[in-house]
Amino acid sequence: MRWISRPGWPGHLLALAAGALTPLALAPFDYWPLAILSIALLYLGLRGLPARAALWRGWWYGFGAFGAGTSWIYVSIHDYGAASVPLASFLMLGFTAGVAFFFALPAWLWARCLRRDNAPLGDALAFAALWLALELFRSWFLTGFPWLYAGYSQLQGPLAGLVPVGGVWLSSFVIALSAALLVNLPRLFPHGASLLLALVLLLGPWAAGLYLKGHAWTHSAGEPLKVVAIQGNIAQELKWDPTQVRAQLDLYRDLSLPQQDVDLIVWPETAVPILKDMASGYLGAMGQVAADKKAALITGVPVRERLADGNSRYFNGITVVGEGAGTYLKQKLVPFGEYVPLQDLLRGLIAFFDLPMSDFARGPADQALLKAKGYEIAPYICYEVVYPEFAAALAAQSQVLLTVSNDTWFGTSIGPLQHLQMAQMRALESGRWMIRATNNGVTGLIDPYGRIVKQIPQFQQGILRGEVIPMQGLTPYLQYRVWPLAGLAGVLLLWALLGRRLRPQERRLFG
């Protein structure tokens, strides 16, 4: 098995296969032990490699992970971006090759500056710290691509109890640490004290996760809210067709009018497919309908802001009418779907760079939460719910979470179910109920433990009725966020860096 840790194609191909295991640990497959196996194979494959070979080993791992785990991008480009099979394949491969460097560069850094082959315990801790730093970096760099985090595999796994303590980040850290420790255990057998400490570090977090699973960090803030969520199941090719606007508005109206004994009626992202100011009459009428029911209606709608120079800016928004108030403008935009980077160069080249409603502006950072029935509701539009820290900042101020989305872009791929899993993780992190309304699924109600209580399956038109309980109190993660864990990672990485520079007799103190 030494070939695994040597430069060359056999090791690279194993890294590719190990990376491809990543999505199998996540939704919709949920074989969570594969997350540990995947990372363990990468860690083993990096052992002893020179920096240049480690860079390519990490790149192949990333190519496997993103190639298999974000294959839904091909569906968006080909099926809905009107790109040919060769062009869609080329763009997909180009994207995958680029984001694979998220793993390549840390692998190079690991081999060049941090790896400590003669200190297996310290080496495992430093590797887990670097893995956490990588996931944090991915959530921020170039607006972020926080997809395929290892920690999502634990949504209902043994580590779920740790998620309210340190978020998905803590789960990822423990998985990476466990993977490295399992690889290094045979090397620790001759060293009793180090072996004992390694076993504590290996088993302790999993035991703590099981012990805390189901612990109530938050409590009720009032009576349950009766919720109706509408899933319109509008085909994407009809979504922005001007001749279909009236039919869509009538559909959501007709599905909502019969609803009685309700507090919140929720429609999906851009359920109103025309600008808010153009739909003022319709929204006013629906607001009166909701008020007559003593309810609030919350819907996605594009918003126009007229500027002093005569131009306009457009936003992806959510607005509340009836017994509620507020309009929220989306802050985290989807590249190419809602805005086009370098648009002066790319617009007009292919249809994928000219998708409908792909010229949105970013909403301001300090926006008030939505208000309905006397409660603060944290809004997330589509992609925003996948950002743990962004979501936590809003959740801490709220009693209920709300996410609206249109996952039609991803067809029958695994993308919508991955997206749902990340939304579930936000509920678990915050200890709050979440309402999720989507155009074509999965619409559902999620409890504070990340479990789906009710749902409408994908690709069906439907009406979901249920209750959510407004919650108050802060989980440790909402209170302290990722900073304690990031600080620990920084200390461990500094420890590893210093350990590489010490003389052999001093290095034992760091091992």
From Swiss-Prot:
Pathway: Protein modification; lipoprotein biosynthesis (N-acyl transfer). HAMAP family: Lnt. This is Apolipoprotein N-acyltransferase. It comes from Pseudomonas paraeruginosa (strain DSM 24068 / PA7) (Pseudomonas aeruginosa (strain PA7)). It holds the Pfam family CN_hydrolase. Its EC number is 2.3.1.269. Belongs to the CN hydrolase family. Apolipoprotein N-acyltransferase subfamily. InterPro entries: Apolipo_AcylTrfase, C-N_Hydrolase, C-N_Hydrolase_sf, LNT_N.
